[in-house]
Amino acid sequence: MYLALRLSAESEQDIRNGLLWDKVEPVTPSEEFHLTVIHSPESTIKLKKHTSEAWEALKAAGAMLTDEPLVAHSEGLVTFGGGIKVAALKLNLTNRLDVFRTLAEAVLFEANIPWSTQWGFSPHVTLGRGRVKLTETFPSVVTFNSMEWRE
């Protein structure tokens, strides 16, 4: 499972319009862009039975996104992955993003659910596989307006 922050429709469209994919090499753009706050190999079933102060605080922070979207500045393209590389948009780590991560860790810790620790938290939006460039119209700021746990 993972906790995803979902981009506003406008930000998702602005990102798609601001990408220039390689025309020679095969590319696979992501179907939907999001920011993974935290990842766990466990299922959300265990999480649905859990309640705590951290869980309530995280739900409240997620509900606030509708009225007060989270704003993040893009820091350019990066590449992640071992054998299969993916292009990603690196984002600055804001205090608000850090709060989401801290609360998500607390929720999983209190529920005795492990989370992936192989890499540190590096806020980014995975764009897809293949070579890509940013055009002049690429947004310098993106907004997230909802949160959800996914399988």
Locate predicted features.
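Histidine-dependent nucleotide/RNA phosphoesterase domain, centered on the 2H-phosphoesterase fold
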Residues: 1-151
